[in-house]
Amino acid sequence: PYLSNMLNFDPDMPAFFLYYEKGELVGLLTVYADDPDVEVAILVHPNHRRQGIARALYRSFETETASYPIESVTFQTERVFLERHPEFASNWGLVEDEETETWLGKDRRPYPLATVSNLDVLLADRSYQDQISQLKFQAFSEEHESREVVDRYVAKALKDPESRLYILLKNGQVIGTCTVDLSSNTNYLYGLAIAEHERGKGYGSYLAKSLVNQLIEQNDKEFQIAVEDSNVGAKRLYEKIGFIKQTQVVYLKPKE
């Protein structure tokens, strides 16, 4: 789960619920809410499952967030968990959403990468904020109905000490962008986007490889990336450059 409320639409809304037993943390519920359609992830220690901890955490979430304008709740889980617990969804009155995503990982081996004279991969600053927002909004407009959500992502990534927002410049113009979250034990890449008119020319691959090479020099972490399974082109790109599937993330919604 994403252990930050930095991107939530209301930073005052409770985002983390902890369940302790005899002083030991055995359950965690996290809330990811970049808009009022929120995503909830619940983790319970394997030795403490089937004891009502997940439901207790969820009841606490419902109570504590009742005064906030939440429009819907989606549960995030993994395909492997549902295969091991096939009764989970029906017990909770949930059905699978058709949208799934795959998390892929990569070791610290650098890429052989020739420099291209008119391309630069740089850490972004505020002067590029509007160009980055525009590019991300065009690339991910189906995910984010409002430009305001994209603007918030970009502004927070520029400010947050645990984030790095990179841009790919071609002849001085922003044609690509990618954010790296450093808050966990991996370099987590997300939001990689190439301007529509520049796709299919290898720039996505160049940006990803360049980022990996730069980050290898800056820290000792391995790499992780998440991609929607419907985004076949991006998934193929990451697999082609050596990212290996780790898990499939599934979203569950209450039955209508």
Q: Model features per residue range: what roles?
A:
Residues 150-214:
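Glycine/small-residue-rich hydrophobic helix-like segments
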Residues 44, 192-194, 227:
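Hydrophobic adenine-recognition pocket in adenosine-nucleotide-binding enzymes
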Residues 27, 97-100, 176, 204, ...:
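A structural microfeature
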Residues 1-25, 143-179:
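Active-site rim helix/loop that mediates acceptor-substrate recognition in acyltransferases
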Residues 119-134:
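A short beta-loop-alpha structural element at the N-terminal edge
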Residues 35-36, 46-117, 252-254:
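Acyl-donor-binding surface of acyltransferase catalytic domains
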Residues 2-65, 76-80, 178-187:
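Conserved donor-binding loop and adjoining core beta-sheet/short helix segment
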Residues 50-63, 194, 200-217, 235-240:
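Conserved acetyl-CoA-binding loop-helix of GNAT-fold acetyltransferases
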